[in-house]
Every structure is written in structure tokens, then in C-alpha cells.
């Protein structure tokens, strides 16, 4: 059997504390037993299920809602003082309670009680029940306290493990971050080096292209100049060939003239004089040939020969010719 004891103050005797006990078998809706005492006297009464249904009909309320209001009024420690009020008439043993709603109040329930002949027994049962309830609550409190201590230890253990996990996690994150920074810096260094290599390669390529362009321009300019140089060289070689041929012819003729003027015998003879005269007579015929050779040499381009060689050659020929022209038989004999 379940029971509930609460402390109330009656409207008729507010200075006296009364104790109200409500006990029931299954549910409050199936009926309950109510006991009221002031510590000296005791009153008790039984409320059946039919009476509860009759009260709900009189209140024009559903039974379940009415039982809920009874629970709040009788089992919740009389509720707030300004919501539920209790009153009891010792002469008629009539107990009733009301509910206040702002300025309106209505009677929630009323029961007829009977006075107990041996109130001490009722009071003793109330005291025993209270002590048992206190002991039970104390045991529950101890059990709950132990459970709380165990949970606190478990919580501390879990908190310690959690802190260790957090520390390990932070250390792992720090380590991973450091490794990530190292890898990132290495990648950045490699990227910078590759970028620098690309820039250097591009600069070298530009330099090579510029050098190739300059080389191509120089080669084109050299190719343009080579034909002119080759032509001038060919002309100079032809002039040198012609002049060398003329010079050799002139030298050979001078040698012949000089050899013709050599005298081997010391004593003069008529034959020698005659031969000399014939030679002198034929000498003017050779002069035109020398003049023709000089004209040919002068008509040819002599830009390739040095001026000094030309002058020496011409002076040698003139001297030989003048010597031949000015020489006479008498002079030759005088010299001999």
C-alpha cells in the first residue's frame, strides 16, 4: 500500500499544524483512505471510486482531470497556500478543500470522516511510517551518494583520459603541422629553384637567339663582301701575270742587247767595225719594238704593281736605249 503524508494548515485553525495522510492500493482513481490528526486526536475516512466519480460529475469535469486535481491538492504537500485551502469541522467531522483562481474559488472535494477512538495508535503508525520513510530515504541517499562518488571517480578517470587524449592530439597536430611546414617549405624551395632554372634557361635561350641572329647578319655581310674581293683579286692576279710577262720579255731583250755589245777581242778589225756598223744600223729597227712594248705596258692596268718597280724597269730600258743610240764606232774604239 502506498501512502503520502503532508503537513497542512486549516482555515479554521491556522495556528495549529495538522498532518494529512492519504493511502491507496493501486491507484488514486480506484479509491483511497484519508487520515487527519493534530497530534492529540485523529479522524479517518474512506473514499470509494464511486464517490470520486460522483464528485467529478458534480464538478462537470472528466474523471481523469478531477483525479489529477486531487493528486495535486492531497499529495503535493497541500500545494501553494494561495491555491488550495483546507477546512475541517470537528463537530460534524466534515472535511473539504477548495481551489482558488484569482478572485474566484470553488469547492474541489469534501469527505465525511470518523473520529478514531485510539488516536495514539494512529499517531504511532504515522511516526513509524515517517521514520521508515526517513531511513529509506537515507539509504537511498547513501546509495545515491556512493553512486555519485563512483560516477565522480569514473568522470575524473574519463576526464584524465580525455585530457591525455587532448594532449596527445595537440602534440600529434603540432608534429603533423611541423612536418607539413617542412614539406611545404621543401616544395616551395623546389618550385623556386625550378622557376629560377626556367628563367635562366629562357634568358640563355634569348642570348643564344641574339648571338645566332648577330652571327647570321655577320655571315650575310661577309657573303655580300666576298664576291667583290674575289673580283678585285682576279683582276690584280691578271695584271700581275701580264706585267711579269712583259718584265721577263724586257729583261730578255736587255740581256740580248747587252750580250750583243760585249767585245771579246782587244784588237780592232775591219770585220768587227763592219759588224758593229751593221748592228748599229739595225738598232733603230728595234726601237719601235721597244716603244710598242712600252705602250702596251702603259695601256694595261698597273694598279697591282708597285710604282718603284715600274720606274726602275722604265729607267733601265731608257738607259739601254740611250747607250745604244749615243754609242758610235769611234767612241768604242776610244774606249778600247
Swiss-Prot record:
The modification Phosphotyrosine is found at residue 229. The lineage of its organism: Eukaryota, Metazoa, Chordata, Craniata, Vertebrata. It comes from Homo sapiens (Human). Changing residue 65 to E: Strongly decreased interaction with NHEJ1/XLF. Abolished interaction with NHEJ1/XLF. Abolished ability to bridge DNA. Abolished interaction with NHEJ1/XLF. The record marks 265-266 as: Cleavage. Changing residue 334 to L: Does not affect ability mediate double-strand break repair. It comes from the Eukaryota. Changing residue 322 to L: Does not affect ability mediate double-strand break repair. One of its GO terms (cellular component) is cytosol. A motif (Nuclear localization signal) lies at residues 270-275. This is DNA repair protein XRCC4.
Amino acid at each position: 500500500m502506498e501512502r503520502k503524508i503532508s503537513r497542512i494548515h486549516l482555515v479554521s485553525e491556522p495556528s495549529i499544524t495538522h498532518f494529512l495522510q492519504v493511502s491507496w492500493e493501486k491507484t488514486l482513481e480506484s479509491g483511497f483512505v484519508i487520515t487527519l490528526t493534530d497530534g492529540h486526536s485523529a479522524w479517518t475516512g474512506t473514499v470509494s471510486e464511486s464517490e470520486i466519480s460522483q464528485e467529478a460529475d458534480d464538478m462537470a469535469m472528466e474523471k481523469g482531470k478531477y483525479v489529477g486535481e486531487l493528486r495535486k491538492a492531497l499529495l503535493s504537500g497541500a500545494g501553494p497556500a494561495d491555491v488550495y485551502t483546507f477546512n475541517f469541522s470537528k463537530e460534524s467531522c466534515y472535511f473539504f478543500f477548495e481551489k482558488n483562481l484569482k478572485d474566484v474559488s470553488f469547492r474541489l472535494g469534501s469527505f465525511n470522516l470518523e473520529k478514531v477512538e485510539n488516536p495514539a495508535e494512529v499517531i504511532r503508525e504515522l511516526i513509524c511510517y515517517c521514520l521508515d520513510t526517513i531511513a529509506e530515504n537515507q539509504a537511498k541517499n547513501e546509495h545515491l551518494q556512493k553512486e555519485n562518488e563512483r560516477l565522480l571517480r569514473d568522470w575524473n578517470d574519463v576526464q584524465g583520459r580525455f585530457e591525455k587524449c587532448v594532449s596527445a592530439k595537440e602534440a600529434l597536430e603540432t608534429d603533423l603541422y611541423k612536418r607539413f611546414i617542412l614539406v611545404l617549405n621543401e616544395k616551395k624551395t623546389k618550385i623556386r629553384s625550378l622557376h629560377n632554372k626556367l628563367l635562366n634557361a629562357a634568358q640563355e635561350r634569348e642570348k643564344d637567339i641574339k648571338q645566332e641572329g648577330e652571327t647570321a647578319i655577320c655571315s650575310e655581310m661577309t657573303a655580300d663582301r666576298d664576291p667583290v674581293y674575289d673580283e678585285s683579286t682576279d683582276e690584280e692576279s691578271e695584271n700581275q701575270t701580264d706585267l711579269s710577262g712583259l718584265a721577263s720579255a724586257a729583261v730578255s731583250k736587255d740581256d740580248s742587247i747587252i750580250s750583243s755589245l760585249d767585245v771579246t777581242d782587244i784588237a780592232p778589225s775591219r770585220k768587227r767595225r763592219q759588224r758593229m756598223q751593221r748592228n748599229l744600223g739595225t738598232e733603230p729597227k728595234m726601237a719601235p719594238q721597244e716603244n710598242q712594248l712600252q705602250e702596251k705596258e702603259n695601256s694595261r692596268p698597273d694598279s697591282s704593281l708597285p710604282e718603284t718597280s715600274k720606274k726602275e724597269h722604265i729607267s733601265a730600258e731608257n738607259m739601254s736605249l740611250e747607250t745604244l743610240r749615243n754609242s758610235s764606232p769611234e767612241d768604242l774604239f776610244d774606249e778600247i
